[in-house]
């Protein structure tokens, strides 16, 4: 009998996906419309337009921008359109939402852009913990993307994986 240690995980053919690798690698700046409101609550069209015209958008140049309003008030749809028209000349991308929601949206786009054919009939483990927090919606997205492509889909680590899906033969 030999005392050779065999790495069964390395020989198993498992592919580990770390969702953190699909996190967007960009800075997202926020533009809160509250600063353009009268008393932080009311949008006056004339004042709003003048404020936008006088606003220095240089900080948003070539950045991804999240546009939202933190005030608990009603903002007409055209106001977001007007802000987008001003930002379009400066920013690289404009999204509705706060920084976190835009980051999640971009994260989701990266997962949806994943080439699922790379994992055709493979055993895949989606890593359960990593360097950055990953929302539940991203785990749902990767499951939708890979199910029916992979031979098996698991969650966790190779040493303690939870089976999620196994293709019927």
Each language-model region and where it sits:
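Short, surface-exposed recognition loops or helix-turn segments adjacent to catalytic cores
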Residues: 99, 123-127, 155-163
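Long, charge-dense
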Residues: 79-118, 158-161
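Short, non-transmembrane amphipathic alpha-helical segments
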Residues: 82-88, 138-147
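Signal for well-folded cores of large energy- and translation-related assemblies
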Residues: 53, 112-116, 147
